[in-house]
């Protein structure tokens, strides 16, 4: 994330516009542009924990991580620079939140790659700000307007739910598998045929559906759920509460905030960061797993069949097995073995 994204490079083409402004950066911001940006004031709101980690080292308390921005975050800001995300519903949710807090008359800049659907920003905001496209470069569009009217925003109105068997799943915009259980997670769940117990870590927990389904089958599991997404963290907590299941839910960039070791780590790891393909999280998951598993502990993940995870698993664990597969997905499992005995040590 050290290099600038195409969207940030487009913003830099207009850097003179921002020198005297108090700028709020938000949305799918994936680089450190705010930390090196020349403006009268800089604030950042992000719902991605790993983006907060990157920026907080430089911007300290001027970076907020959370599901929604607060009045304190946007205080004194007269300009919004919003990075368009992959999910249109997530954009609607975030912009409704941000524009409900910003003052009428503030400048609104929306930037994003064309393939992300940023063109729909004009229509989406037509009732609140008249956007005009002011630049097109690096396969991105940059739009500008002024806030004419603050939208109303109620975060509670954005919750949705569905069921997986007897499990109630609570979801929010931007959460993976928001409308139904995805086929990869379904295949992963199918590999758990017998009840088990112990401590289990779900990395990239989404709405918490894996833990809640497995908790019905194996109620003695001690669960820890983690994700980088603030929306996923809140959705997991709501799903757990709806099903009367206790678990620890924390924000963590893979293992960054994970303490202790587990009997099992499960995951349906992402291979995108926003709209960009990225195997970073999955590579960190696999390479760091042995440091967070007991001897005999298992890493069980589901992934698209074409992704290069077998070699990573073999490098980290020495071997792996395929528990299930279909036309698109495979479920891999690798086990932590006992380290070889040092022949120089006495028994």
UniProtKB/Swiss-Prot annotation:
EC number: 2.1.1.172
Keywords: Cytoplasm, Methyltransferase, rRNA processing, S-adenosyl-L-methionine, Transferase
Transmembrane segments: none
Localization in the cell: Cytoplasm
UniProt keyword Transferase present: yes
GO molecular function ontology, one term from the record: 16S rRNA (guanine(1207)-N(2))-methyltransferase activity
Reaction equations catalysed: guanosine(1207) in 16S rRNA + S-adenosyl-L-methionine = N(2)-methylguanosine(1207) in 16S rRNA + S-adenosyl-L-homocysteine + H(+)
CDD domains xref list: AdoMet_MTases
Gene Ontology CC annotations of this record: cytoplasm
Classification via InterPro entries: DNA_methylase_N6_adenine_CS, Mtase_sm_N, rRNA_ssu_MeTfrase_C, RsmC/RlmG, SAM-dependent_MTases_sf, Small_mtfrase_dom
SUPFAM superfamilies: S-adenosyl-L-methionine-dependent methyltransferases
Domain of life: Bacteria
NCBIfam families in UniProt: PRK09489.1
Assigned protein family: Belongs to the methyltransferase superfamily. RsmC family.
Biological function: Specifically methylates the guanine in position 1207 of 16S rRNA in the 30S particle.
PANTHER family associated with the record: RIBOSOMAL RNA SMALL SUBUNIT METHYLTRANSFERASE C
Quaternary structure annotation from Swiss-Prot or TrEMBL: Monomer.
The name this protein goes by in its record: Ribosomal RNA small subunit methyltransferase C
Naturally occurring in which organism (per UniProt): Yersinia enterocolitica serotype O:8 / biotype 1B (strain NCTC 13174 / 8081)
Originating gene: rsmC
